[in-house]
């Protein structure tokens, strides 16, 4: 434990608050606490946290990132892809029973280091990602050091009681309620997420919706106007992502489109079952499971594909939809998820009812046979991202909110 404290103390001071090469010194210094952040070996993990930070300095905000990981998990290493971040490992109880008190353990690991950092380089605000454990630790730090804090809510389970059951789940819910009530603002990535927070908070919560963004330069349209004949999905291979539904829909559609194939980027516990399903549906030869890929590989695949489909039934927003839209592709997504606040059906994307096989078959059939419609939707999708969902847009919204909270 002493070695951990010494190491993390050194890391925090080594990071400091870097002002980069620009001459204009930002007026505001923000400490970001996050359980997910990109590394050189996994540049997709937490990209939705890292990418807006690159634009924050333009809006007078400088961020110091502390990415955290429990001691009992495999270390992510120290290969953060940006010099403003360091990984810190903290002790906690493994399993669901350990999630509720994890923020207190994290606070205990951080308080002395953050206090010294605050004394030497004033921290104006703490921004935590997810209520547990980072939000809880941020609220405790906020109270101890008299620094305002905000918490971003990234998913549709803001109280963690859907993923953790029984007594432990109820404990998680109560701690999360405390976090949302105590934070200066609960930042929600969609209105749907905000509604879930308000419905479950059991007391007034100050929420603000700030949508995630997309790096529109990385996820740019293809130079060539001759895409490959593939339908693409990007997502973990877990039931809620809808890969099974899409395989069954493609089994019905592909006989009418003999040149079309299906590519899936992602990995997870459903891999073997989905592979067997593709074989059972007699489309195994036209389905490629590509596994995890880098951000560049994902962007290249999106540029190459004919259209993007992910009939996920449980998405707070879904950054992959914005990324595909930014590459000028028609996107198929589900109603009732965060993305339907951005997609206008038939205009800049295509929406189906969750779990509706016939709806998905119809959507695929319409879009695969209509080049002009795909092109119109893709162009509108790209305009949508450029007009409202770039990293600069998100950074500007965050900077405005930060200043409201410290005023």
What function would you assign to each model-found segment?
Residues 44-47, 147-150, 158-178, 216:
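Nucleotide-sugar donor phosphate/pyrophosphate-binding loop at the beta->alpha transition
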Residues 2-4, 8-77:
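N-terminal subdomain of nucleotide-sugar transferases
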Residues 180, 292-293, 300-305:
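Short alpha-helical donor nucleotide-sugar binding micro-motif in glycosyltransferases
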Residues 31, 223-250, 263:
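Conserved donor-binding/catalytic core segment of Leloir-type glycosyltransferases
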Residues 344-346, 350-357, 366-371:
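Conserved acidic donor-binding segment of nucleotide-sugar-dependent glycosyltransferases
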Residues 330-333, 343:
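Short hydrophobic beta-strand element within catalytic cores of glycosyltransferases
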Residues 69, 192, 213:
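Carbohydrate-associated surface elements
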Residues 313:
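Aromatic "clamp/platform" in nucleotide-sugar-dependent glycosyltransferases that forms part
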